[in-house]
A protein has these predicted regions:
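Short, surface-exposed secondary-structure junctions/capping segments
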Residues: 58-75
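Acidic, low-complexity, intrinsically disordered interaction modules
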Residues: 18-63
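Generic detector of intrinsically disordered, low-complexity, polar/charged segments
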Residues: 7, 13, 31-32, 64
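Enrichment for repetitive, rod-forming helical segments
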Residues: 11-13, 37, 61, 75
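Negatively charged, low-complexity tracts enriched in Asp/Glu with abundant Ser/Thr
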Residues: 1-22, 69-73
């Protein structure tokens, strides 16, 4: 995991329940049922993730500058 991915992971973990975060073309917020909700700007894609690492893994598909994520390295 590169520095950009680590920084993003840290920012996501600091989100409060009523906070949100914009990254590229995605709106990320803490879900009231736990975890994180990720919605695309055009609202054509909505995903729910149990933890911040999964969010970073998902975003790395769209932003190659995040590098290889923990999930990809384990594969």
């Amino acid at each position: 995991m590169n520095e950009k991915a680590k920084q993003l992971l840290g920012e996501l973990e600091m989100l409060g329940e009523r906070s949100d975060f914009w990254y590229e073309d995605f709106w990320i917020t803490r879900s009231p049922i736990g975890g994180y909700a990720v919605v695309s700007v055009k609202r054509t894609l909505t995903e729910h993730f149990s933890n911040a690492q999964r969010v970073v893994d998902f975003l790395s598909k769209y932003d190659k500058s995040l590098g290889k994520t923990l999930y990809e390295v384990k594969l």
